[in-house]
């Protein structure tokens, strides 16, 4: 109630239920700075389609500073059509999370891979059969190259 706008998900506006919700948000909102386990997607946009490549990199670096500025680091995702942005997000300069995905949601993990969080989230990468690789500062990454936007583990937002 401090300036965000609910884009979808208002079935129970007065109840204590959490329906899937998509909302615009600002980095300074308390809820954005806290770890939330709910079907809520906060959208913090960045950049401009008309930006030059140099401006685009500066905008992405600013977005990554916001992204990595929170104390949690379990799972993250970027939605982009630009391979350069996806590669930056997955690189050592990009997402500081145990799981980093491109064009797919943040829930779920590749169980065979090392998974877990960074910073104040999770217990490192001690889970999964490849957990030893966590000591190599490696992240589990998923890139969706299709134009469909599937959610992990078959989750569906039926907002119709």
Give the label of every model feature segment:
Residues 1-12, 28:
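Conserved small-domain helix->loop->beta segment predominantly found in fold-type I
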Residues 13, 17-160:
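Conserved C-terminal structural/oligomerization subdomain of aldehyde/semialdehyde dehydrogenase
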